Curated annotation (Swiss-Prot):
Top-rank taxon, per record: Bacteria
Gene3D superfamilies: Rhodanese-like domain
CDD domains: RHOD_YbbB (cd01520)
Purpose of the protein: Involved in the post-transcriptional modification of the uridine at the wobble position (U34) of tRNA(Lys), tRNA(Glu) and tRNA(Gln). Catalyzes the conversion of 2-thiouridine (S2U-RNA) to 2-selenouridine (Se2U-RNA). Acts in a two-step process involving geranylation of 2-thiouridine (S2U) to S-geranyl-2-thiouridine (geS2U) and subsequent selenation of the latter derivative to 2-selenouridine (Se2U) in the tRNA chain.
Lineage start: Bacteria, Pseudomonadati, Pseudomonadota, Gammaproteobacteria, Enterobacterales
Gene name of the record: selU
Organism this protein belongs to: Salmonella arizonae (strain ATCC BAA-731 / CDC346-86 / RSK2980)
The protein's name: tRNA 2-selenouridine synthase
Length: 361
């Protein structure tokens, strides 16, 4: 039986995974849709690992059973049973498909539940994800470029073969790019990207991928090197919308929607504080590139804009610091980067013209 094919099918189907690894392992990397219900917590796993090194496998196994027994064992068993009842098509998963998933499988069988496990565990799924990404990005790639506020992400999302890298990374790429959802670990981001590629590829006869023109990193996540190499050679279509239209997109995204999201998440007072800190942090992150004097001036303008927004709800004041930020920093930076790829540009136009051009391809 072809295990790689089975792994692909499991990932494409969003098969629920009951991941019994320790929390620290899960945080370092997990598959999309996995839930972490550990057999051993971090300290328990560390103790068993130390015992294994000093006294061998049998002693470590014995210690593990002593640590996870009685009420602790029963509580964890109830959690696994509840997870299986919620996800009857789920699979058990540990690091390598070894003792931990087999132990949990056996304990569940003793209660009348027969839950399958992932042969090879997370490591096998991880290797499948890495290999799938490498294989799939060999297909042609078309990049959508343009200055900040050009609506590139929206264009990508509209394409049936579009891959929203920023959505997968939970970050919009700029110093103001973070969202309310924390970014995933690097391995989890790569896994999520691989699954997205597999899903899109399975839905259609794919001629090429459509991606946003990104740098090496999106927030804390960096793009897999195999993808970066392919993107560096890819043709680019550039969105060139009027400056005023870009400002309105940025107003909606950063001053209206982010304000709403923070208030929704943390309430009026806490949300406003978080929103204010978010904007200040974005400006602070590029203070050295702006120069400390310019940074201080724009920070003062930001403070006045926030006071205005708080008092009357208007976001107009933010234009007084956003416009110079675009003119003096973001636009020159992107245009400089784009000049280095000038030979790859295949089309330029407004957002609608690019959308029409993409449909015609």
């Amino acid at each position: 039986m072809n295990h790689e094919t089975n792994y692909h099918a499991l990932l494409i189907a969003d098969t629920p995974l009951i991941d019994v690894r320790a929390p620290i392992e899960f945080q370092q990397g997990a598959m999309p849709g996995a839930i972490n219900l550990p057999l051993m917590m971090d300290d328990e796993r560390a103790a068993v690992g130390t015992c294994y090194k000093r006294q061998g496998a049998d002693a470590a196994l014995s210690l593990g059973h002593r640590l996870v027994c009685g009420d602790i064992r029963q509580q964890r068993l109830e959690a696994w049973k509840a997870a299986y009842q919620r996800f009857p098509n789920g699979y058990l998963c540990c690091a390598r498909g070894g003792q931990r998933s087999h132990i949990v499988q056996r304990w569940l069988q003793e209660t009348g539940i027969d839950c399958p496990l992932i042969e090879g565990g997370y490591k096998a799924l991880r290797q499948t994800a890495i290999q799938a990404t490498w294989q799939l990005v060999q297909k042609p790639i078309l990049l959508i470029g343009g200055c900040t506020g050009s609506g590139k992400t929206q264009l990508v999302r509209q394409q049936p073969n579009g891959v929203d890298l920023e959505g997968l990374a939970r970050h919009r790429g700029s110093s103001f790019g973070r969202t309310l959802k924390p970014q995933l670990s690097q391995a989890s981001f790569e896994n999520k990207l691989a699954v997205e590629l597999l899903k899109i590829n399975a839905r259609q006869t794919l001629k090429r991928w459509v991606l946003e023109d990104e740098g090496r990193t999106i927030g804390a996540n960096h793009l897999p090197e195999c993808l970066r190499e392919r993107m560096a050679q890819a043709p680019i279509t550039v969105v060139e919308d009027p400056f005023a239209l870009r400002l309105e997109r940025l107003r909606e995204e950063y001053f209206i929607r982010m304000h709403h999201d923070f208030i929704h998440a943390y309430g009026d007072e806490g949300g406003w504080q978080a929103y204010s800190e978010y904007l200040h942090h974005g400006l602070f992150a590029i203070r050295r590139r702006l120069g400390l004097q310019r940074f201080a001036e724009l920070t003062n303008t930001l403070d006045m804009a926030l006071a205005d927004q708080l008092s009357n709800g208007s976001t107009d004041g933010h234009m007084a610091w956003l416009v110079p930020l675009l003119n003096e920093y973001y636009d020159p930076m992107y245009r400089y980067q784009l000049e280095k790829k000038a030979a790859n540009i295949v089309f330029r136009g407004t957002w609608q013209e690019v959308a029409n051009w993409l449909k015609a391809q």
